[in-house]
Design a protein with these regions (language model features):
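A ligand-binding cleft/hinge motif common to bilobed small-molecule-binding domains
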Residues: 24-37, 157, 173-184, 228-232, ...
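Periplasmic-binding protein-like
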Residues: 25-57, 80-90, 115-116, 192-200, ...
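Alpha-to-beta junction loops
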Residues: 26, 145-147, 163-173, 215-216, ...
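Acidic, polar ligand-binding/catalytic clefts
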Residues: 27-36, 45, 138, 142, ...
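Ligand-binding clefts/hinges and TM-proximal coupling segments of bilobed small-molecule sensing domains
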Residues: 32-37, 55-106, 224-262, 295-298
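Short helix-initiation/N-cap motifs at beta->coil->alpha
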Residues: 39, 134, 149-162, 204, ...
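Extracytoplasmic small-molecule ligand-binding "clamshell" domains
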Residues: 55, 63, 71, 75-76, ...
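Flexible hinge/capping segments at coil-to-helix
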Residues: 200-217, 232-241
Length: 298
């Protein structure tokens, strides 16, 4: 009898494993984390480099004002989907948008620290890093008579890389403006606002950070998702101030218990593989990269 029970248990485990391994991107959904505020992205500039910061703000402010920033986000989103083989995706037409820049004979360099797994802001195409952030900084370089050197590094190291770089340096990586990061770098004007989402199974969709309590949660190391879930696990929780329906400021506290397990990854693609295999229950990440990631056919 014991042998029969053991065989049954093994078969059940194998069936579960095969089911998990057979999951597809289409089995998952990205739901807005409704208990969080939206986040603002900025280009991180080496502290004290006022000339470079002004040049970045000139491009960012102009593109936001005339709608070109939205056009670039839409174009690179469509291109990332197309190159990844997303269902129904077609190659987008850039129209009048510049997608290549001529740095001429420039010798002075602006070093751009980024992390290429964050489409549409940065991703690999034909062996090169492209995307919204690279477009911004390419235009900045042309305006300043300089050229770009792109360094693809781990996301959580970017503020330190910018801080320690001896030359003109920026962090362009869909980076949320936070007080903690401001201690190391200066930030440009806001060029995009995003919400965090919870990526989870469609049949068990999760739409708040609080509902991650007791689950296995995946984040990219050093991102807002990492910082928020880490704070939520402390006694104080993740706190922010917002306005209620009467226009009064109120403090919101988001907490999860210590039973929550957090797995940190260098790239979201690795987190997705573990989600599909059942090693984690959800991913906490930015919305556009999540939608692009899930759109890929598999």
């Amino acid at each position: 009898m014991k042998k029969i029970i053991s065989v049954i248990l093994v078969l059940l485990m194998l069936a579960t494993l095969m089911t998990a391994c057979g999951k597809k991107n289409s089995d998952f959904v990205a739901e807005d984390a409704t208990d969080l505020l939206q986040e603002d992205f900025g280009i991180a500039v080496k502290k004290g480099n006022d000339e470079l910061l002004a040049a970045v703000n000139k491009v960012v402010d102009a593109w936001v004002k005339d709608g070109k920033m939205t056009e670039y986000v839409d174009y690179y989103t469509a291109l990332a989907d197309f190159e990844a083989g997303a269902d129904g995706a077609t190659e987008p037409d850039a129209g009048e948008l510049a997608t290549t820049w001529d740095f001429g004979s420039a010798t002075e360099v602006i070093t751009v620290y980024t992390e290429s797994g964050f489409a549409p802001f940065e991703f690999i195409s034909n062996g090169e890093v492209i995307g919204v952030d690279i477009a911004i900084m390419s235009q900045v370089a042309v305006d300043m008579g300089k050229k770009l050197e792109i360094k693809d590094v781990a996301f959580d190291t970017i503020p330190t890389c910018v801080e320690q770089d001896a030359g003109d340096a920026v962090g362009a990586a869909g980076m949320t403006i936070t007080d903690e990061r401001k201690e190391k770098v200066d930030f440009s004007s806001i060029y995009y606002s995003s919400t965090l989402v919870v990526v989870s199974a469609k049949d068990k969709a999760i739409s708040t950070v609080k509902d991650l309590d007791g689950l296995k949660v995946a984040v990219q190391e050093g991102t807002s998702g990492d910082l928020i879930i880490s704070a939520a696990m402390t006694d104080d929780g993740h706190k922010y101030v917002t306005e209620n329906d009467d226009g009064e400021e109120v403090e919101v506290v988001v907490k999860v218990s210590g039973d929550t397990q957090v797995s940190r990854y260098k790239q979201y693609a690795l987190a997705l593989e573990d989600l599909k295999s059942g090693r984690v229950d959800a991913i906490l990440m930015d919305k556009l990269p999540a939608l692009t990631m899930l759109a890929v056919a598999d």
